[in-house]
């Protein structure tokens, strides 16, 4: 389990996180929802120790963040971080050299799942297919938790559906997943728990049944309902 306990973070004079507390379990998909700029990505980077927190505590499987935490969690950003001139096969080689947890068999299975070829050059792929490569690079690591920043942002509907299908496949296995998004339409059925953020605080946590009730609503609509009580 990933646990955040009263986490705070300030950038300059702006308080980005104001006592954020929630949990994300293995085998479950937790979604951080909210409009842009409410602290979702900051939370992800804090879990990865890429952004130091000011106060509070973050635990992974009951332990405070340490060097070993990197072996338990992977972060998939919303833009591919590999050199765009690389072929997919070269990106796989890079990952294998850099990460002991790289699983080449799973990488090939994911490549087949998305109908991509190792010889494809990343710079020549569509935005949707680039997002799939980014996803493969994260999912092919043998870790307990996968953090995904806006995996559905700005891609075509077909790519959205393919990526959504991964979450219900054996390729996720029993790993915990945390997703950030500013739009929950079309993915309500994937989520086990949703955490609604605004202005650095958690407005509400939604269970599976409550998430289903948000179908067809925008994040802004959901926020308005919460504020109205």
Question: Model-found features: residue ranges?
Answer:
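The feature captures the beta-strand-to-loop junction immediately N-terminal to the Walker
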Residues: 33-35
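Helix-to-loop junction immediately C-terminal to a conserved catalytic motif
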Residues: 48
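Conserved ABC transporter NBD signature motif
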Residues: 56-69
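ABC-family P-loop ATPase nucleotide-binding domains
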Residues: 79-133
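Catalytic Walker B motif of ABC-type/P-loop ATPase nucleotide-binding domains
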Residues: 146-150
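H-loop/switch region of ABC-family ATPase nucleotide-binding domains
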Residues: 181-182
């Amino acid at each position: 389990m990933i646990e955040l306990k009263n986490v705070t973070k300030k950038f300059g004079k702006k308080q980005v996180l104001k006592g954020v507390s929630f949990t994300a379990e293995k085998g479950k998909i937790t979604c951080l929802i909210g409009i842009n700029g409410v602290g979702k990505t900051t939370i992800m980077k804090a879990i990865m120790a890429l952004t130091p927190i000011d106060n509070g505590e973050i635990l992974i499987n009951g332990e405070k963040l340490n060097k070993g935490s990197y072996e338990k969690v992977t972060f998939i950003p919303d833009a591919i971080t590999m050199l765009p001139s690389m072929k997919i096969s070269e990106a796989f080689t890079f990952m294998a050299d850099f990460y002991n947890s790289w699983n080449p068999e799973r990488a090939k299975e994911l490549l087949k799942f998305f109908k991509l070829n190792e010889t494809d050059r990343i710079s020549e792929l569509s935005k949707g297919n680039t997002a799939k490569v980014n996803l493969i690079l994260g999912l092919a690591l043998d870790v307990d938790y996968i953090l995904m920043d806006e995996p559905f942002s700005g891609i075509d509907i077909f790519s959205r559906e393919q990526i959504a299908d991964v979450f219900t496949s054996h390729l996720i296995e029993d790993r915990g997943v945390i997703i950030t998004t500013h739009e929950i339409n079309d993915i309500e059925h994937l989520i086990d728990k949703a955490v609604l953020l605004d202005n650095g605080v958690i407005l509400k946590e939604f269970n599976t049944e409550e998430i289903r009730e948000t179908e067809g609503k925008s994040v802004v609509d959901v926020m308005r309902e919460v504020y109205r009580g």
